[in-house]
């Protein structure tokens, strides 16, 4: 019996699950294939920050794409809870990007003065900053406050998207290896897997840092590379920080239950997920230098994730020029959680022939 779908999605991280969710909502027959379990790699490791201004500089197209995606989260969280019953722990707690040098002060003050229309961004002097976050180090020179930024639980988001996809008619096959792509002339017609052959009008590769290995089999030279990031979490009694704190080389994300997630190192061009003492020592040094009370925190755990980066530094969301019936969505690097909602919409629009998003051409190039 031929197993035919409208779309096959290869990759069960947050990007693949977001695409499956959007396509299932539109009544498409979708199969998502994951070689491990959902949210098993970068989506499991991510801190879940929704930081537009802290992660993306300037007022370019990718910034506006990220802002649009961030603003989708309140309704997405509600929809996922109603459909799947799962809470993605979305909070709009705001984010503060710290300045520690005079050069950083000038840069952030200028950023605040040039904030895009409608974006609530403001500079906080040291006194104002300490009234917001009194436990920060008194050596901090001020901060850029972005009240609309927030965070989610990245694993729960991915799992909720997957569950909601299934409840809307999609199928998900975990622990399934993709052996090869099936072809007819210059068109991809499906995939050959450890659980059989599956056919579809469109195959979407959304395998994160591993996407390039899949594309290599088709002669598609996708220029991307992996970046390892190490993180750790601690528990503190009460709240020593209300908002996400971001500074060069380190972020501190408050979560439910007194947990703080702290990350992340950057080790490019490696798939080795080993956690190093050097990486953790550097993070601990940076984190305690801006939030001294962390020295008394209770250690919880450490982990590492592999993030996909492109040579152009922007994600790729679009069709293959070489193969009909093949689309690609990867390269989101540190912004996979932030960009997941809009990526799902863009890719679902693309498959339906609606290349109407004004930023679509930019992120595909």
Predicted regions, residues:
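C-terminal catalytic lobe of FAD-dependent flavoproteins
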Residues: 154, 291-365
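Helix-loop-beta segment of a Rossmann-like dinucleotide-binding subdomain
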Residues: 86-97, 110-111, 122-168, 265-270, ...
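Helical element adjacent to the flavin cofactor pocket in flavoenzyme catalytic cores
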Residues: 144-202
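N-terminal Rossmann-like FAD-binding beta1-loop-alpha1 element of flavoenzymes
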Residues: 5-32
